Amino acid sequence: IESDNTIQKLSKKDNCFAIAIIKKYEMTLQEGNHVVLVNPGDMGNMGTIMRTMLGFNYYNLAIIRPGVDVFDPRVLRASMGAMFHLNIEYFDSFEDYLKRFPSHDIYTLMLKGATNIHKVESKEGYHSLVFGNESSGLPDEYLDYGKSIFIPHSHHIDSLNLSMALGMTLMHFSKDEFKDKEVL
């Protein structure tokens, strides 16, 4: 209805012509390899991460609170629909996550990581790849969880963008799955 300003009040976009009310789907993680994000804060990064995960056959995303709302329109838009293929679950703490998945091999991605990612081989069984916040990374206490690893890069930068580091890590950990893949 042209005279109704409700859509304009609810939408953050100028060219919105319809609004839908939906119930949020409650998701839980399944067994398998996981990506764990500790306190992620960037909406665009979150959507890009979801899309990248799907591209490398990672279907489980754990988010340690506080973290972005995966149902935010900016996240949904950036995910290009990937979100609807993932299992996503929020946890109040990393310890709560570990209680649910105690048998996973833990790999923490950190600037102070002990092992170069190129020297890490994924073991049999499931693993969890743990990444920190975009601006601060993982706190030093995460050095005590599992195996801490780093992605080597030139001295010209301090760190890599979270979604880029995640993409490189997923490529490394899924290299055996895709090594014989032909052009799409």
Question: Residue spans of the language-model regions?
Answer:
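RNA substrate-binding interface of SAM-dependent RNA methyltransferases
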Residues: 26-112
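Active-site/ligand-binding-proximal alpha/beta "capping" segment
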Residues: 108-158
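Short beta->alpha connector loops at strand-helix junctions that form conserved
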Residues: 2-4, 38, 64-65, 87, ...
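Short, charged, surface-exposed secondary-structure boundary motifs
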Residues: 9-14, 97-98, 117-118, 158-164
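Short, hydrophobic beta-strand segments that form beta-sheet elements in well-ordered domains
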Residues: 1, 19-22, 90, 105-110, ...
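Conserved beta-strand segments that form the floor/walls of ligand-binding pockets within enzyme
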Residues: 19-21, 35-36, 62, 129, ...
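Structured adenosyl-cofactor binding patch, chiefly the S-adenosyl-L-methionine
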Residues: 18-20, 50-56, 68-84, 140-184
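Arg/Lys-rich RNA-binding interfaces used to dock onto structured RNA substrates
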Residues: 1-43, 174-175, 181-184
